[in-house]
Amino acid sequence: MSEQIKANNSELPPVTQVGVVVRDIAKAVDYYSTTFGWGPFKISEFEMKGADYNGRKIDCKIKMARARQPGIEIELIQSLEGDTPYTDFLKEKGEGLHHLGIRVEDVGATLAKLSGQGIRPVFSLSYPEIGLAFAYLNSDSVGGVMIEIMQMRRKDNI
């Protein structure tokens, strides 16, 4: 017998992204492309300056590969420099599913609403000049997969 659980009043949008942490992005892109036909992947490097990670400011550099599939975006992430949630994830769990992402209109407003439920971000950064902001919400107590809320100026920012 199945049971249906009623959602709370957070009214968050559906998941639109699956984030996977990998050690070698080229190897992962090759695997997902040749094995499953996913892609094309757009590969980019990002320097994140002044990100908030567990209450402290950090600088780090990552490489990302992103591909769109019907209804979902696949994001592969490799940490290149610095102490990040990705390096900690690799140390604690190895490669694998890191986060499920949802797009919101306003990250700040969403965080304010979720804070009323005791939910706090563990990693966040904002680039107001390009209309990009994101925050990871820790869910180690249930399932261990982070939730990423992201705000982007354009609907498809790949």
Predicted segments, located by residue:
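N-terminal beta-strand motif that seeds the catalytic metal site of vicinal oxygen chelate
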Residues: 1-27, 95-104, 155-158
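A short, acidic/glycine-rich surface segment
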Residues: 3, 49-53, 84-87
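Core segments of cupin and vicinal oxygen chelate
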Residues: 10-13, 21-70, 109-135, 156
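Short, structured motif recognition centered on aromatic/hydrophobic residues
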Residues: 15-22, 32, 62, 72-77, ...
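Histidine- and/or cysteine-centered catalytic micro-motif in compact active-site loops
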Residues: 46, 79-81, 105
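Helix-adjacent hinge/juxtasegments
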Residues: 63-95
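Short, solvent-exposed interaction modules
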Residues: 90-99, 110-112, 116
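Acidic/histidine-enriched, glycine/proline-rich intrinsically disordered or flexible terminal extensions
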Residues: 146-158
